[in-house]
Amino acid sequence: MGTPSHELNTTSSGAEVIQKTLEEGLGRRICVAQPVPFVPQVLGVMIGAGVAVLVTAVLILLVVRRLRVQKTPAPEGPRYRFRKRDKVLFYGRKIMRKVSQSTSSLVDTSVSTTSRPRMKKKLKMLNIAKKILRIQKETPTLQRKEPPPSVLEADLTEGDLANSHLPSEVLYMLKNVRVLGHFEKPLFLELCRHMVFQRLGQGDYVFRPGQPDASIYVVQDGLLELCLPGPDGKECVVKEVVPGDSVNSLLSILDVITGHQHPQRTVSARAARDSTVLRLPVEAFSAVFTKYPESLVRVVQIIMVRLQRVTFLALHNYLGLTNELFSHEIQPLRLFPSPGLPTRTSPVRGSKRVVSTSGTEDTSKETSGRPLDSIGAPLPGPAGDPVKPTSLEAPPAPLLSRCISMPVDISGLQGGPRSDFDMAYERGRISVSLQEEASGGPQTASPRELREQPAGACEYSYCEDESATGGCPFGPYQGRQTSSIFEAAKRELAKLMRIEDPSLLNSRVLLHHAKAGTIIARQGDQDVSLHFVLWGCLHVYQRMIDKAEEVCLFVAQPGELVGQLAVLTGEPLIFTLRAQRDCTFLRISKSHFYEIMRAQPSVVLSAAHTVAARMSPFVRQMDFAIDWTAVEAGRALYRQGDRSDCTYIVLNGRLRSVIQRGSGKKELVGEYGRGDLIGVVEALTRQPRATTVHAVRDTELAKLPEGTLGHIKRRYPQVVTRLIHLLSQKILGNLQQLQGPFPGSGLSVPQHSELTNPASNLSTVAILPVCAEVPMMAFTLELQHALQAIGPTLLLNSDVIRALLGASALDSIQEFRLSGWLAQQEDAHRIVLYQTDTSLTPWTVRCLRQADCILIVGLGDQEPTVGQLEQMLENTAVRALKQLVLLHREEGPGPTRTVEWLNMRSWCSGHLHLRCPRRLFSRRSPAKLHELYEKVFSRRADRHSDFSRLARVLTGNTIALVLGGGGARGCSHIGVLKALEEAGVPVDLVGGTSIGSFIGALYAEERSASRTKQRAREWAKSMTSVLEPVLDLTYPVTSMFTGSAFNRSIHRVFQDKQIEDLWLPYFNVTTDITASAMRVHKDGSLWRYVRASMTLSGYLPPLCDPKDGHLLMDGGYINNLPADIARSMGAKTVIAIDVGSQDETDLSTYGDSLSGWWLLWKRLNPWADKVKVPDMAEIQSRLAYVSCVRQLEVVKSSSYCEYLRPSIDCFKTMDFGKFDQIYDVGYQYGKAVFGGWTRGEVIEKMLTDRRSTDLNESRRADILAFPSSGFTDLAEIVSRIEPPTSYVSDGCADGEESDCLTEYEEDAGPDCSRDEGGSPEGASPSTASEVEEEKSTLRQRRFLPQETPSSVADA
């Protein structure tokens, strides 16, 4: 190979090697020093040695002098002797002095004068080192915490059999007897004595048609099938009864108790396999009620409540059935026959059945304004005391109640044990004043007064003392003595109600005469009465689901009672009473009826029997099939992958839905509250359960089995239309809630639990203080005041409970009674606030057990800390979601260190900052505090206050503001914000993209459009600078600019603010180009994520996420108007402002190929026709924004979004110098739009609670969207009916079967009819939804095309 040059180089000097290396690496020459002569080298060595000797001599001299000073003898002084204790004290003081000096230097207190210069030097050197090394104090970041197992996991034990010492039959019976309420131990043991075992072989019948229906059957082991006969004589299995469940009918139990027992007609139950059944005869209850008569009223009341809530809720509210639920074959009682009057009780065939509520009825068009006469029989009392005029039509309830403490006031019952009748009294929502109790009754009326009522009606009242000489002035009784008519009517009423002492009716009954067209009571009225028809008839109407029309349920004839169901249950009236022609009736108020029941409890049986007699045979069948189910806290209702065989309706309590991913990770999907429909999509589509649903707290549900639904579809095919509506509403709701334009791809929102706000549709809220310094009473009163503007609110604390229910109310023996009483209060109020004690008392435990959500309240100006009560709470499995609420003084600084508050706690679902009025922090005694808030409650709550914002969050009425991206055009956001403030629209949540994230962050920090405008104008002015961008230019590998100048401009605005420290909840959107996904930022450094959301490709480099290092770009590429994100965070209404550029859509068609020279000629030639063809840059831009455009179309067509777009198309993206012009355009546009909203009452509807306006519709979509299908497929799924079992029933007589299965003939009633197919005649076409009706005509938006469902026959 020869001698290479490489070998020669190895022998070269080291200087030459270094020279060559540096020349190759740096690309420039390095001059190497030449070798020096020998003589100068020797001279240098000599000079160095001399210097070293000189330094050594100096050091030796200094050491010698120091030693001489130490050897100098000191003058001897007196030598002292010390005792041991003095030495200990001396050295002890010396040590303590040293310790005090060291600690004082640590806390920067007064130190000695000698140490101060040292400390200053140390600090100065430390600062210099920080500047050199650029050491910065890192701001704390929010720690990612997963929800605890108690939130995401249900209990593994599904029953109490393994953990209980009681036998299974006792537990099963206890569980199923609870359907009739809680029985004390002696009552339950008395019932268990009547329990009988019954063993059945496969195919054996438990009962068959024709046999007595007088028992409750509980399955201990095996399987029972509940069957109903079909049209072809075959039996259809409508329900399978597993061990632990029961077969019973509340109406049948009521018939036995009231003494009107009937045999089974159509229902049968047989054993699907060998089974053991426990039978409890209903006669056992009669024996118990003989010993404990007060329990009778309570049990009957519970039966009525569950009949109304379970049966009517499922069949009417969700399946749309109306007059199919009531019988029309009741024979009227002729009390005062009048010739020529019809006696029919059912609607007339061929007459109009549907009445429009928007217009006037045919029969009442001319008589609606006629007066209403009534002759009253007042209660005796002191002479001369006038009675207040009463009106048949109750006035609407006030919007704001001044009740601060418990509104139920029952005189004489406080402080003592609660009896069953007391519970029934409160269930009926009766309030008895102390004055009435003391005086023996209400005050009497003055003789013969005629008063004008507010509704335009007249009341004629008189005293019984003068009635002997007075005659009846109206109706068929003209000329007869009023007293004789009144006494005869009272005798008939006493006979009907089986009142042993007729004097109980004295002073408690009013005689009324209503002119034709008068509305006696309206649907939804709370203050109801009992009406006993004497002459004429009362028509009972009910509002149809999703239509502004009413349907006639039945006609009450003479001798019938109306309104007894609402009187017994205490629930609002479920129908409207209207006198279509002149009618005379007796009226007993609810309070008077309960006074009669207190004197004679058996009266409740007669009233309940009249309700049961009105129920149709179909309702009796459904009473067997539809179950009332109770689920204890922590127990799973069903698990993911289970078979979908039923649908549930939440009656009381709260459920949580959790999904388990393929990786095994569990995530929170949503929560369900009162009135929500669960599992309907899975049940109708025959899909396995998509998630696991467990109870957050003790929950009651109505269970609608799959077989029962199939039977209803066979009997009433019009139900299919309603099911199609329900199912399409659920699926459409899921489609609207899909985040991102490509569901299932990486461009959609990751389904994390923090991206949803399950704290909505709450019924109960527990309030827990962090420390004793939190003004809990004032805070709860402020929150109650804000909630009262939304709906009835109740505040409970331990003092209120003891005052109302007695000192022993919190004892364990009273647990079931207290639970029942609290459940009543939750039913009667929109939301109940539970104020805990400052320690872990039994009341605190009860509050946490009852809570749907727990608010942890702390003081924002204190050091972040965890309270002792919270630490105790961590050791218990609390399933309710927790939210942190920090209170701040009105004039104090803004929020800080929120991250530290959150990091030291376990998982919280969210946090809120509240700016509180001064009165909340004032120190007052409880009496003075209540006196102060009495005045506060007399005023309406400010909708812009932070407590009103918290109230909207808790009730699910949050209003979100979403600001889109568009460069300088985003300055118009501030003008719209100013107009929004002037219109009085509150904002509870702010989000945005690009420039929208910048403006939104300013508004979330300032909460004032004026201050937001001032700070945004300063920043826009800096954006017009030319020098800074020029200095920021760089070599364009990734971007044209380094981003440093833009970073400084954003940092100057927000400093080191954290997103968690903003006043309003805030989020923004970025595009993660590392993971090809959309990122939603709700915590972290504010300026960084705002900058990331404003990062345009090519101009600025992507921002590195400080959390995971992912590269973040402008969120406008994927979601320029993130209204769907705000919706997923719990917003009811989203106001979305779009300022993006409008792309040209009218492009030229140039054929299959395109020549660039041709385009150049077209552009240069002034006489050629201009062509519109995008260049390469525009094509790339359009490709980048494809998903954004599609997402925008989805947002614009959604029902929850108020889409706004100012006229800003004439401004360019970088026109920041035209800030004031763009602001004025937005302001003028906002004034015009919000002015139209004010005139159209859109704002008021926006602030109205959705539970009060949308009672008939489910508020929550089901858990997961199933594969999309066409409308024909949807109809096929819903209308699919399983063939009945091939078993021919031979135990039901033809006549008996026809009584229940044949459609009734409508032969009476002036305005009710039904066509052959069962669908209503004359029904108007389905109108748009209520949400669409609220939209302002000034909005610019695009609607989804409405699809018309096919006919029921086609389905």
Swiss-Prot record:
Positions annotated to bind a nucleoside 3',5'-cyclic phosphate 2: 492-614
Mutant lacking the gene: phenotype: Embryonically lethal. At 9 dpc, embryos are smaller, and their development is delayed. At 10-11 dpc, the development is arrested with signs of resorption. Heterozygous mice have lower catalytic activity towards the synthetic compound phenyl valerate in the brain and show increased motor activity.
The keyword Lyase is annotated on this UniProt entry: no
Sites bearing Phosphothreonine, chain numbering: 345
Signal peptide: none
Comp. bias intervals (Polar residues): 343-361
Record-listed E.C. numbers: 3.1.1.5
Leftover remarks: Specific chemical modification by some organophosphorus (OP) compounds leads to distal axonopathy in humans and chicken. The effects of these compounds in mice appear to be less severe. Mice treated with 1 mg/kg/body weight of ethyl octylphosphonofluoridate (EOPF) have elevated motor activity in the long term. Higher doses result in increased mortality.
Recorded family membership: Belongs to the NTE family.
Stated name of the protein: Patatin-like phospholipase domain-containing protein 6
Source species: Mus musculus (Mouse)
Gene: Pnpla6
